[in-house]
Amino acid sequence: MAKKVVEVLKLQIPAGKANPSPPVGPALGQRGINIMEFCKAFNEKTKDMMGFTIPVEITVFSDRSFTFITKQPPATDLLKKAAGIQKGSSNPLKDKVGKITKAQLKEVAEKKLPDLNTDDIEQAMKILAGSARSMGIEIVD
């Protein structure tokens, strides 16, 4: 018989840096999950994505076991890294804080494609171009 799903948790944790302190510890502890087991598994799975915040979806079962799925880093993090900036513009219409090329945009779109609600790379590029525009990042040819 299949295990009964009790809850699905969504967290954003820095890659390779999950530890029992907040927000991870309290979120998992109150659901009876072995926190250290999750931290070790998450850190092992995300060690090659250091420097990014990784969205993770944790499925908790009735017998206190769990599974988790890691997603790609947020589009904003990927765009900031491609543009070489620390943060987006506070006024994106007036202040442009960085530039990325269409090739860089395509690279980010290919990385983010599994998490977007499209299968077309051109459509994914349009979605990410909108995010870049709202961050004050200019797209050049």
From Swiss-Prot:
MF-aspect GO terms: large ribosomal subunit rRNA binding; structural constituent of ribosome
Gene Ontology BP terms: translation
GO cellular component: a single term: cytosolic large ribosomal subunit
Post-translational modification: One or more lysine residues are methylated.
PROSITE patterns (alphabetical): RIBOSOMAL_L11
InterPro entries: Ribosomal_uL11, Ribosomal_uL11_bac-typ, Ribosomal_uL11_C, Ribosomal_uL11_C_sf, Ribosomal_uL11_CS, Ribosomal_uL11_N, Ribosomal_uL11_N_sf
SUPFAM superfamilies assigned: Ribosomal L11/L12e N-terminal domain, Ribosomal protein L11, C-terminal domain
Keywords: Methylation, Ribonucleoprotein, Ribosomal protein, RNA-binding, rRNA-binding
Matching Pfam families: Ribosomal_L11 (PF00298), Ribosomal_L11_N (PF03946)
Gene3D superfamilies in the cross-refs: Ribosomal protein L11, C-terminal domain, Ribosomal protein L11/L12, N-terminal domain
Assembly description: Part of the ribosomal stalk of the 50S ribosomal subunit. Interacts with L10 and the large rRNA to form the base of the stalk. L10 forms an elongated spine to which L12 dimers bind in a sequential fashion forming a multimeric L10(L12)X complex.
Task of the protein: Forms part of the ribosomal stalk which helps the ribosome interact with GTP-bound translation factors.
UniProt cross-references to PANTHER family, sorted A to Z: 60S RIBOSOMAL PROTEIN L12 (PTHR11661), LARGE RIBOSOMAL SUBUNIT PROTEIN UL11M (PTHR11661:SF1)
Xref: HAMAP family: Ribosomal_uL11
NCBIfam families, per the entry: L11_bact (TIGR01632)
Family per record: Belongs to the universal ribosomal protein uL11 family.
Protein known as: Large ribosomal subunit protein uL11
Organism per entry: Nautilia profundicola (strain ATCC BAA-1463 / DSM 18972 / AmH)
Gene label: rplK
